[in-house]
Amino acid sequence: MAEPVMMTREGDIVTILLNRPESGNRQTDATWAKVTEMFDAGSRESRLIIFKGAGDDFCLGREAMGQATPVLEAYAVRERSETIFNLYGAFRNARVPIIGVVQGRAVGLGCALAALCDITIAGHRARFQFPETAHRIMPTIAFSALVDRVPRKAASFMMYSAQEIDAQKALTFGIASDVVPSNDLDRAVSTLVEHLKKMPLPAVLALKEYARSAFGMSTQSATDFARNLHATVNSFSGMKS
Protein backbone atom coordinates (compact mmCIF):
# COMPACT_ATOMS: atom_id res chain seq x y z
CA MET A 1 0.00 0.00 0.00
CA ALA A 2 1.40 3.38 -1.01
CA GLU A 3 2.27 5.90 1.67
CA PRO A 4 -0.31 8.74 1.90
CA VAL A 5 2.48 11.34 1.98
CA MET A 6 5.98 10.97 0.59
CA MET A 7 9.21 12.95 0.82
CA THR A 8 11.94 12.45 -1.76
CA ARG A 9 15.27 14.18 -2.25
CA GLU A 10 17.27 14.82 -5.42
CA GLY A 11 20.50 16.58 -4.50
CA ASP A 12 19.45 19.53 -2.38
CA ILE A 13 15.89 19.64 -3.77
CA VAL A 14 13.18 18.10 -1.58
CA THR A 15 9.77 17.13 -2.94
CA ILE A 16 6.83 16.50 -0.61
CA LEU A 17 3.98 14.68 -2.34
CA LEU A 18 0.42 14.23 -1.11
CA ASN A 19 -0.19 10.71 -2.38
CA ARG A 20 -3.87 9.84 -2.06
CA PRO A 21 -5.12 10.66 -5.56
CA GLU A 22 -8.14 8.37 -5.19
CA SER A 23 -9.51 10.68 -2.46
CA GLY A 24 -8.32 14.01 -3.82
CA ASN A 25 -5.26 13.87 -1.54
CA ARG A 26 -7.35 14.40 1.58
CA GLN A 27 -5.34 13.58 4.67
CA THR A 28 -6.14 12.67 8.27
CA ASP A 29 -4.86 14.81 11.12
CA ALA A 30 -2.22 12.14 11.77
CA THR A 31 -0.86 12.41 8.24
CA TRP A 32 -1.03 16.21 8.31
CA ALA A 33 1.16 16.03 11.42
CA LYS A 34 3.55 13.87 9.41
CA VAL A 35 3.59 16.50 6.65
CA THR A 36 4.57 19.08 9.27
CA GLU A 37 7.50 16.87 10.32
CA MET A 38 8.53 16.48 6.68
CA PHE A 39 8.60 20.23 6.13
CA ASP A 40 10.61 20.77 9.30
CA ALA A 41 13.15 18.11 8.28
CA GLY A 42 13.24 19.05 4.61
CA SER A 43 13.78 22.69 5.40
CA ARG A 44 16.94 21.91 7.36
CA GLU A 45 18.53 19.85 4.59
CA SER A 46 17.64 21.50 1.27
CA ARG A 47 17.72 24.64 -0.85
CA LEU A 48 14.02 24.47 -1.71
CA ILE A 49 10.93 22.33 -1.24
CA ILE A 50 8.49 21.41 -3.98
CA PHE A 51 4.99 20.70 -2.65
CA LYS A 52 2.50 18.92 -4.89
CA GLY A 53 -0.36 16.46 -5.03
CA ALA A 54 -0.67 13.23 -7.01
CA GLY A 55 -3.43 12.71 -9.55
CA ASP A 56 -6.01 15.13 -10.93
CA ASP A 57 -6.37 17.39 -7.87
CA PHE A 58 -3.89 19.21 -5.66
CA CYS A 59 -5.71 18.67 -2.36
CA LEU A 60 -9.33 18.58 -1.19
CA GLY A 61 -8.41 19.24 2.45
CA ARG A 62 -8.92 17.28 5.65
CA GLU A 63 -10.29 13.75 5.59
CA ALA A 64 -13.35 14.62 7.69
CA MET A 65 -14.25 17.89 5.90
CA GLY A 66 -18.03 18.18 5.53
CA GLN A 67 -18.74 15.08 7.64
CA ALA A 68 -20.47 14.99 11.01
CA THR A 69 -18.00 14.95 13.90
CA PRO A 70 -18.47 14.39 17.65
CA VAL A 71 -19.23 17.46 19.74
CA LEU A 72 -16.10 18.28 21.73
CA GLU A 73 -15.40 20.65 24.59
CA ALA A 74 -13.74 23.90 23.57
CA TYR A 75 -10.34 22.91 24.95
CA ALA A 76 -10.39 19.62 23.03
CA VAL A 77 -11.34 21.47 19.84
CA ARG A 78 -8.45 23.85 20.39
CA GLU A 79 -6.03 20.96 20.91
CA ARG A 80 -7.24 19.29 17.71
CA SER A 81 -6.81 22.54 15.79
CA GLU A 82 -3.16 22.76 16.81
CA THR A 83 -2.35 20.11 14.20
CA ILE A 84 -3.30 22.55 11.45
CA PHE A 85 -1.76 25.63 13.07
CA ASN A 86 1.50 23.69 13.46
CA LEU A 87 1.30 22.81 9.76
CA TYR A 88 0.82 26.48 8.87
CA GLY A 89 3.81 27.31 11.06
CA ALA A 90 6.00 24.81 9.21
CA PHE A 91 5.25 26.64 5.95
CA ARG A 92 5.81 30.11 7.39
CA ASN A 93 8.95 29.21 9.34
CA ALA A 94 10.73 27.07 6.75
CA ARG A 95 14.20 28.45 6.08
CA VAL A 96 13.93 27.61 2.36
CA PRO A 97 11.37 28.65 -0.25
CA ILE A 98 8.39 26.36 -0.80
CA ILE A 99 7.11 26.02 -4.37
CA GLY A 100 3.51 24.85 -4.61
CA VAL A 101 2.37 23.08 -7.77
CA VAL A 102 -1.42 23.20 -8.17
CA GLN A 103 -3.41 21.18 -10.66
CA GLY A 104 -7.14 20.58 -10.46
CA ARG A 105 -8.89 21.56 -7.26
CA ALA A 106 -7.44 23.09 -4.10
CA VAL A 107 -10.22 23.05 -1.50
CA GLY A 108 -10.36 24.07 2.16
CA LEU A 109 -7.06 23.21 3.79
CA GLY A 110 -5.70 22.46 0.32
CA CYS A 111 -6.46 26.03 -0.73
CA ALA A 112 -4.90 27.39 2.47
CA LEU A 113 -1.68 25.46 1.83
CA ALA A 114 -1.56 26.63 -1.78
CA ALA A 115 -1.69 30.20 -0.46
CA LEU A 116 0.98 29.53 2.18
CA CYS A 117 3.59 28.38 -0.33
CA ASP A 118 6.16 31.08 -1.07
CA ILE A 119 5.61 30.64 -4.80
CA THR A 120 2.53 28.90 -6.19
CA ILE A 121 2.43 27.84 -9.84
CA ALA A 122 -1.06 26.87 -10.98
CA GLY A 123 -2.26 25.18 -14.13
CA HIS A 124 -4.94 27.17 -15.94
CA ARG A 125 -7.57 24.55 -15.08
CA ALA A 126 -6.88 24.80 -11.33
CA ARG A 127 -9.75 25.80 -9.07
CA PHE A 128 -9.65 27.19 -5.53
CA GLN A 129 -12.33 27.20 -2.85
CA PHE A 130 -13.04 27.55 0.87
CA PRO A 131 -16.38 25.68 1.28
CA GLU A 132 -16.50 25.72 5.08
CA THR A 133 -19.49 28.06 5.47
CA ALA A 134 -21.52 25.79 3.19
CA HIS A 135 -20.93 23.06 5.78
CA ARG A 136 -21.93 25.30 8.73
CA ILE A 137 -18.31 25.70 9.82
CA MET A 138 -16.95 29.08 10.91
CA PRO A 139 -13.60 29.11 9.04
CA THR A 140 -11.14 31.21 11.01
CA ILE A 141 -8.53 28.43 10.89
CA ALA A 142 -8.53 28.66 7.11
CA PHE A 143 -8.85 32.46 7.20
CA SER A 144 -5.71 32.75 9.32
CA ALA A 145 -3.66 31.19 6.52
CA LEU A 146 -4.49 34.16 4.31
CA VAL A 147 -3.87 37.14 6.59
CA ASP A 148 -0.32 37.71 5.36
CA ARG A 149 -0.99 36.53 1.79
CA VAL A 150 -4.34 37.74 0.46
CA PRO A 151 -6.01 41.19 0.55
CA ARG A 152 -8.84 41.54 3.05
CA LYS A 153 -11.67 41.95 0.54
CA ALA A 154 -10.57 38.96 -1.53
CA ALA A 155 -10.15 36.74 1.53
CA SER A 156 -13.51 37.82 2.98
CA PHE A 157 -15.24 37.08 -0.32
CA MET A 158 -13.83 33.57 -0.46
CA MET A 159 -14.73 32.82 3.15
CA TYR A 160 -18.25 34.26 3.15
CA SER A 161 -19.31 33.13 -0.32
CA ALA A 162 -17.77 29.61 -0.35
CA GLN A 163 -17.55 30.11 -4.12
CA GLU A 164 -15.00 28.33 -6.28
CA ILE A 165 -12.65 30.65 -8.18
CA ASP A 166 -10.53 29.93 -11.22
CA ALA A 167 -6.76 30.16 -11.50
CA GLN A 168 -6.73 33.64 -13.01
CA LYS A 169 -8.82 35.04 -10.16
CA ALA A 170 -6.57 33.21 -7.67
CA LEU A 171 -3.67 35.04 -9.30
CA THR A 172 -5.33 38.43 -8.78
CA PHE A 173 -6.25 37.48 -5.19
CA GLY A 174 -2.62 36.57 -4.34
CA ILE A 175 -3.16 32.84 -3.83
CA ALA A 176 -1.25 31.94 -7.01
CA SER A 177 2.03 33.46 -8.21
CA ASP A 178 1.75 32.41 -11.86
CA VAL A 179 -0.74 30.61 -14.08
CA VAL A 180 0.48 28.47 -16.96
CA PRO A 181 -1.20 26.07 -19.40
CA SER A 182 -1.95 22.92 -17.43
CA ASN A 183 0.01 20.80 -19.91
CA ASP A 184 3.08 22.99 -19.27
CA LEU A 185 2.86 22.95 -15.47
CA ASP A 186 5.75 20.54 -14.88
CA ARG A 187 7.94 22.36 -17.40
CA ALA A 188 7.25 25.75 -15.78
CA VAL A 189 8.14 24.39 -12.34
CA SER A 190 11.32 22.75 -13.69
CA THR A 191 12.42 26.03 -15.27
CA LEU A 192 11.97 27.86 -11.97
CA VAL A 193 13.75 25.14 -10.00
CA GLU A 194 16.71 25.15 -12.40
CA HIS A 195 17.07 28.90 -11.90
CA LEU A 196 17.01 28.55 -8.11
CA LYS A 197 19.60 25.77 -8.29
CA LYS A 198 22.00 28.20 -9.98
CA MET A 199 21.56 30.86 -7.30
CA PRO A 200 24.09 30.91 -4.45
CA LEU A 201 22.51 29.18 -1.46
CA PRO A 202 23.05 32.20 0.85
CA ALA A 203 20.95 34.30 -1.53
CA VAL A 204 18.16 31.71 -1.62
CA LEU A 205 18.03 31.59 2.17
CA ALA A 206 18.32 35.35 2.62
CA LEU A 207 15.41 36.07 0.28
CA LYS A 208 13.21 33.72 2.31
CA GLU A 209 14.41 35.30 5.55
CA TYR A 210 13.52 38.75 4.25
CA ALA A 211 10.13 37.72 2.86
CA ARG A 212 9.25 35.97 6.13
CA SER A 213 9.74 39.11 8.21
CA ALA A 214 9.69 42.25 6.09
CA PHE A 215 5.99 42.38 5.25
CA GLY A 216 5.12 42.55 8.94
CA MET A 217 7.49 45.46 9.57
CA SER A 218 7.10 49.17 9.20
CA THR A 219 8.52 50.56 5.97
CA GLN A 220 11.50 51.98 7.83
CA SER A 221 12.24 48.72 9.63
CA ALA A 222 11.93 46.72 6.40
CA THR A 223 14.32 49.14 4.71
CA ASP A 224 16.83 48.88 7.54
CA PHE A 225 16.59 45.08 7.46
CA ALA A 226 17.12 45.07 3.69
CA ARG A 227 20.15 47.33 4.01
CA ASN A 228 21.77 45.05 6.58
CA LEU A 229 20.92 41.77 4.84
CA HIS A 230 22.08 43.09 1.45
CA ALA A 231 25.46 44.10 2.82
CA THR A 232 25.93 40.94 4.87
CA VAL A 233 25.02 38.40 2.20
CA ASN A 234 26.44 40.08 -0.90
CA SER A 235 29.83 40.58 0.76
CA PHE A 236 30.06 36.89 1.70
CA SER A 237 32.74 35.03 -0.25
CA GLY A 238 30.37 32.12 -0.83
CA MET A 239 28.29 34.31 -3.14
CA LYS A 240 31.06 34.19 -5.75
CA SER A 241 31.51 30.42 -5.88
Predicted regions and their residues:
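Crotonase-fold acyl-CoA enzyme core
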Residues: 2-5, 89-201
